[in-house]
Amino acid sequence: MLDLIKSHNNWISIIKPWYQLARLDKPIGFLLLMWPCLWSYTLGSTIFSYNISLKYIIYFILGSILMRGAGCTWNDLLDKKYDAKVKRTQSRPLASNKISSVNAIIFLIFQLFLSLLILIQFNNVTIIIGLLSIIPIIIYPLMKRITWWPQVFLGITFNW
């Protein structure tokens, strides 16, 4: 029984930094992405008389989780040295060196790849809009260096 508890704790200690890097412990971010997607999908389905598909609802939910995680990973990669100096952020996996930058980049690529696999299930207009949404995701962490109001740009990013 003790071995089971030890292996359970080891498994959790391995997964926890990745879970935190993707901010799965703070679901508000993916909810901010997911609800507008689902709302727009249901409105569009009603207006254009499409049947609402559980498959697309699942795609929106998974895509929101993955892209929020990718955005947080990107943000933490760019802010690693700053996060290490700020009390609120110094325990983040990259700032505390629980995850290396190289491994975080691999994780970012993995999240983006899975997101792309989901995105290509949609029509061409949705794919183009989805690909263009990468631009504000890339830019947001950099805005913290040039403005006092980076959250305004974060709002634009979430509302894309």
Predicted regions and their residues:
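Cytosolic, membrane-interface loops and tails of multi-pass inner-membrane proteins
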Residues: 2-16, 72-99
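Juxtamembrane/transmembrane-helix boundary motifs in multi-pass membrane proteins
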Residues: 8, 12, 24, 47-55, ...
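Membrane interfacial helix-start motif at the N-side
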Residues: 16-29, 98
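Intramembrane alpha-helical segments
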Residues: 19-20, 92-160
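The first (N-terminal) embedded transmembrane alpha-helix
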Residues: 24-43
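Alpha-helical transmembrane segments of integral membrane proteins
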Residues: 28-32, 51, 55-59, 63, ...
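Membrane-embedded alpha-helical segments that form the functional core of polytopic membrane enzymes
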Residues: 37-38, 42-78, 88, 112-116, ...
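Perimembrane helix-loop junctions in membrane proteins
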Residues: 44, 48, 80-83, 144-148
